């Protein structure tokens, strides 16, 4: 494994959590820690947690004393901390608190309720050294007591209580209680010239002090070197090492894999295989109800788009992607329905999963070549695909289904369908046909066709090929040459009209409109109240439809509310509007009436490119006039979620860069041979990632397209560096049996070396060199499309 040398100004993210590959993390009671080298309070080499918000804070840090001087802050060290190794549950750092004295600090989480550390102190001078160590602990409880210096079974420890936990800190070597300003355990460390000394500490937090003490003492007695070797072996077997011409990129890709692995929990009776959470931070991991049903959305189930992205981040762990597919399919019902958010506590999203599961399964198969897996999942995936064409989802029966809820789209904040913000349109998504859904179904269909061909399932092939042709035609009908974009269209009229404001008023009453339309329109009525009090809102629309006079009543139970905002979409489309009556409002409530706007542009409308639908001419126009337009989508830090910014409050949504969507868009660029553009997109995204890893020591859920600053949750899955897209753009795919597929050539500005399980490939601008685990090398001229085998 690579030996790093990362300082505080380099890309870093130092969260620690129990690793599901090496232990059994507790989904309901999981303690997550983060190392803050110098930026915490006090400024120290500070480990901190909140035990999932059961304490205001718990902090552990060392203090060093020599020749009457005491240092705590890394900025005061003779040599600042340098990160040498990092894994999901392990960190090691080197530093020198004083000149000539080096410390190797290791941190390890062996299980969810404990953390351990080991300090190796080395005297590199030619004189004896007298140094003192204090291990300090600061607990700010919510309910309970701060850490106190106590004895348990004649051992000096620090113990406290917060909520239902009784944390205990234990230090080997027979420490005394420290005299300093913080609760601490202290040891004298006399060292001869060239000598070293090693000691370990542990913290455990169970329900009672005695149980915590016993767990801490047992953990301190574990064989550190053997445990570290095991950690390194497991990670070496599943991690891809990347060496580019930019060490910041290398670190970002390595931290992305570390973080991605840390998001997994083992399967249980609710989900049969390991599943993931969206982020794993010190404030997470505690279920007050004790069953996980109260967890927020970040911990409430695996979602399909994030599962697809996560699989691309872990090219060395294809079996995990197989397990994610099986988890989704474990929720399947007789009609083919598969839930969109199955969770480890039995959570369900209650909506049909978006059609990316066959794509995920095919991606997993390409990594593992496990044909038995394909044979197992093909029938249920086919049933799932067909479920999308049931009348409940294809309401007009035209073969182009509609989304049921914005959650399914992977872009829940889409302003076209977002109810939560007054500035968003908020139309009922079930009244809209989206080229993104049609394209996803087409791509799903193509994946099923590939499976059927591999498995020799000729009976299903004909039906799938017919579906694929129909979906492609319908998606292309959404193409708008003038804007060089695909557009949404109305479910019933199949038209993509621009929206128009019709009227405004305050409070209940009638609006006389007297408007006629050549092309039928659908109405959108938005209400903004002055307070959060419930309104018995009802709306009556009178006008003409294609079937004659119509009086449509929208009852209060059909109105969608969020805080002070409500949005109502008419069920009918109208050729003439006569009168709209609004009832149940207060006098100062604002009512706005408009026709639905189908011309709003967002990142989901690039999915036809990902699916490989447009012909070359349309694809070139979509890429060059749409995607790469700097006045619409293309920004210094990536492709923005929306083409325009309706108002300043919309900035964090419309100008956000979301990595799963960069992945899909980048894959679309590669499909049409735009390798240089894909490399540039990766570079822009990486600039945002690295900026935040350096300044904030964290990934973020999204990034600002113009400024690069992080948006949303820290260290979220959706903000990890796009390793999968990078490898695809580089043209490197590792296969079982030390085999390697190379395609194209290196479009990046420097040579790139990628290593996996002893296999190494270096891609330069015009040639590649492959080194097998036995040392044999093969040189190839690029561009190439070659399967490289060890024999």
How does the language model describe each region?
Residues 1-254, 503-596, 686, 710-720, ...:
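Terminal accessory carbohydrate-recognition/targeting modules of carbohydrate-active enzymes
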Residues 127-132, 321-322, 368-378, 389-400:
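Short secondary-structure capping/junction motifs at helix and strand boundaries
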Residues 143, 334-338, 387-396, 473-484, ...:
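Secretory-pathway/luminal and periplasmic proteins that interact with or process carbohydrate-rich
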Residues 190-219, 292-296, 335, 339-356, ...:
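The feature captures the catalytic groove of carbohydrate-active enzymes
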Residues 213-228, 248-255, 317-330, 371-389, ...:
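Extended, well-ordered alpha-helical scaffold segments
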Residues 233-376, 433, 599-614, 620, ...:
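Substrate-binding groove/exosite segments of carbohydrate-active enzymes
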Residues 242-260, 268-272, 466-491, 508-517:
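Gly/Pro-rich turn-and-neighbor structural signature
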Residues 455-497, 520-522, 528-599, 603-606, ...:
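Non-catalytic carbohydrate-binding regions of carbohydrate-active enzymes
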